[in-house]
Amino acid sequence: MPMSAETTSLPAALPIALDAAGGDHGVTPNVEGAVQAARAGVPVLLVGPRVALHAELGKHAGSASLPLTVVDAPDVIGMDEHASDVRSRSGASINVCTQLVKEGKAAAAVSMGHSGATMASALLTLGRLKGVDRPAILTHLPSKKGFVTLLDVGANADVKPVYLAQWARLATVYLQVVEGVQDPTVGLLSIGEEDHKGSQLVLAAHALLRELDGHSIHFYGNVEGRDILQGTTDIVVTDGFTGNVVLKLAEGEAKVLFGWVREALGSRLQTKIGALLVRGALRGLAERMDPSTYGASILLGVRGLTLIGHGSADARAVKNALLRASRAYEAKLIERLEAALTPQDG
């Protein structure tokens, strides 16, 4: 069935640290999304400029009684600044978020702000899981069978074959413990289904994934671009450059298609009447294809939960990101990943 962060709202033992001024629209959607998540039972630490956050909270009736706490961090790394700024700005809001996770005061760090800064902060503050050379950004796309998991979608443009094998293992555990997929299948993105097709990277990665098949992963084989949204496999692994292109292409195509549908249904009286009849179905389809339904992408491979959202995120996306972080924490994702990566004796 289609996955949605909105379907489950588990209370976390620890609050989620939200980079509450990050993103294109500042504190407004972040605070509104946090209020919605708090009403669903998820406690949130709002990390950012104290005065602005309290002023925004004041616009939401009843927010004072919700599990929301403001953590003052007036320094915010802007979308047009350098990711490397996290090294010299220890008090930046995203650094405060990841530090709270490291100290065990927050279950996860969530940011709709500078994605590069978020990745850099997570790596510098939390470090990598043992057995992981490079973390990857994992996201979900709607598919014919519900949703498909795609990684990497931007953390690593240049990769080695072993990275893809590691990411397949990480994504397998993620789907098992967070999304409840019992035996997720892994596909390797290539230009043909045949084992001998693909770049040198794909050929080498294919051999590694085949070795893991039946042990830590269920390897389907190569998949092509057309297979992704068909849901041929539960997981598709690729390098971050290709994955990011696939993600942006899918998002852009969805917008174009819905634009065409709106134009077609609104062009004549008969079609306007027909539009009223199919409005419910179209609304459900639009929700499945809306990135805000999935909230945020997870940075897999660091020693602490870190979720990265769109800079243009609205309140719904923020809420769903917080709910997803809560689910991952309750599922003990980091502990399960560490266990899966630990060599077994015998």
UniProtKB/Swiss-Prot annotation:
InterPro entries: FA_synthesis, Phospholipid_synth_PlsX-like. GO terms for cellular component: cytoplasm. One of its GO terms (molecular function) is phosphate:acyl-[acyl carrier protein] acyltransferase activity. It comes from the Bacteria. Pathway: Lipid metabolism; phospholipid metabolism. The keyword Transferase applies. Its main location: cytoplasm. It catalyses: a fatty acyl-[ACP] + phosphate = an acyl phosphate + holo-[ACP]. It is found in: Cytoplasm. Keywords: Cytoplasm, Lipid biosynthesis, Lipid metabolism, Phospholipid biosynthesis, Phospholipid metabolism, Transferase. It holds the Pfam family FA_synthesis. One of its GO terms (biological process) is phospholipid biosynthetic process. Its EC number is 2.3.1.274. Catalyzes the reversible formation of acyl-phosphate (acyl-PO(4)) from acyl-[acyl-carrier-protein] (acyl-ACP). This enzyme utilizes acyl-ACP as fatty acyl donor, but not acyl-CoA. Homodimer. Probably interacts with PlsY. Belongs to the PlsX family. This is Phosphate acyltransferase. It comes from Deinococcus geothermalis (strain DSM 11300 / CIP 105573 / AG-3a). The gene is plsX.
